[in-house]
Swiss-Prot record:
This is Dihydroorotase. It comes from Salmonella arizonae (strain ATCC BAA-731 / CDC346-86 / RSK2980). Zn(2+) 1 binds at residues 17, 19, 103, 251. GO terms for biological process: 'de novo' pyrimidine nucleobase biosynthetic process; 'de novo' UMP biosynthetic process. It comes from the Bacteria. The keyword Zinc applies.
Length: 348
């Protein structure tokens, strides 16, 4: 019997979906991402969404100002799609290397999405332009109709929005972000080379029982919400299969403790401190460590048409203790897996 590996050496990974926020929160959370990842797709859903080239340039600079000396990190900026967005502004940002992709939030689907898109028809000229440019569309894949159960929002989105959109724009590159269901896993698996998906550590590690049985755990509450264990298992099987159009996207989404532990708490898991080790745990549990590097470091660049990072990261079989909380200026952050240990840690 072969002894389990003690070291995992992979090309420096990228995070293809992260929320870095702004202000003091940004200064606190950026180093957890920039220390490990070479690049990150930065979500544009600030309180004032990133809808112009100038706003993206300014936000990118605030991020870079928060990167500690010695970290080699490039934020990849995204444009927040709205019903009134100017396609020329989007194209300018893409050609100038400011916008890497554009983000579709259905209106009111998640944090700071009230400015989001009300219908695909409203932004069809913009999407047609993106198809011509080869610019990826990043999709929060949930419908938000009041009559649709929250656990069914993703599956309904596939039937009513995603598939009609991809039928109309057959060469549009689409990332189905943070997929959570067996429906989405199968849909992406059956798709063509223009369709990919990101998957978070929490949706691979947990299901809704973990969040709701024996007491409600607000720090596992995120959107899309954790689903049944059959959906969790489908996601685990997808990544364990070595499927090349699924890649790392943490959806790390920090909120202060008082905004999570309250009568109406915010959605989001701040998983940046533990995400890479958490993914390694899942791949090891699935006997799929052979596919770990591709998921973290190779599949994303291949889909985006970007080079693989030149540097390397080593994970060691050395238990990492996740802190109970992380200080903020006037509050604290409770990270994903707070107080627990993860058996793979990034070698410093």
């Amino acid at each position: 019997m072969t002894a389990p590996s003690q070291v995992l050496k992979i090309h420096r990974p990228d995070d293809w979906h992260v929320h870095l926020r702004d202000g003091d929160m940004l200064k606190t959370v950026v180093p957890y991402t920039s220390e490990i990842y070479g690049r990150a797709i930065v979500m544009p859903n600030l309180a004032s969404p990133i809808t112009t080239v100038d706003a993206a340039i300014a936000y990118r600079q605030r991020i870079l100002d928060a990167v500690p000396a010695g970290h080699d990190f490039t934020p990849l900026m995204t444009c927040y799609l709205t019903d009134s967005l100017d396609a020329d502004e989007l194209e300018r940002g893409f050609h100038e290397g400011v916008f890497t992709a554009a983000k579709l939030y259905p209106a009111n689907a998640t944090t700071n999405s009230s400015h989001g898109v009300t219908s695909i028809d409203a932004i069809m000229p913009v999407l047609e332009r993106m198809e011509k440019l080869g610019m990826p569309l990043l999709v929060h894949g949930e419908v938000t109709h009041a009559d649709v159960d929250i656990f069914d929002r993703e599956a309904r989105f596939i039937d009513t929005v995603m598939e009609p959109l991809r039928q109309r724009l057959t060469a549009l590159k689409v990332v189905f972000e943070h997929i959570t269901t067996k429906d989405a896993a199968q849909y992406v698996r059956d798709g063509n080379d223009y369709l990919a998906a990101t998957i978070t550590p929490q949706h691979l590690m947990f299901n809704r029982n973990h969040m709701l049985v024996g007491g409600i755990r607000p720090h596992l509450y995120c959107l899309p919400i954790l689903k049944r264990n059959i959906h969790q298992q489908a996601l685990r099987e997808l990544v364990a299969s070595g499927f090349t159009r699924a890649f790392l996207g943490t959806d790390s989404a920090p909120h202060s403790r008082h905004r999570k532990e309250t009568s109406c708490g915010c959605a989001g898991c701040f998983n940046a401190p533990s995400a890479l080790g958490s993914y390694a745990v899942v791949f090891e549990e699935m006997n799929a460590l052979a596919h770990f590097e591709a998921f973290c470091s190779l599949n994303g660049p291949q889909f985006y048409g970007l080079p693989v990072n030149k540097g390397w990261v080593e994970l060691v079989r050395d238990e990492q203790q996740i802190p109970e909380n992380i200080a903020l200026a006037d509050d604290s952050l409770v990270p994903f897996l707070a107080g627990e240990t993860v058996r793979w840690s990034v070698k410093k």
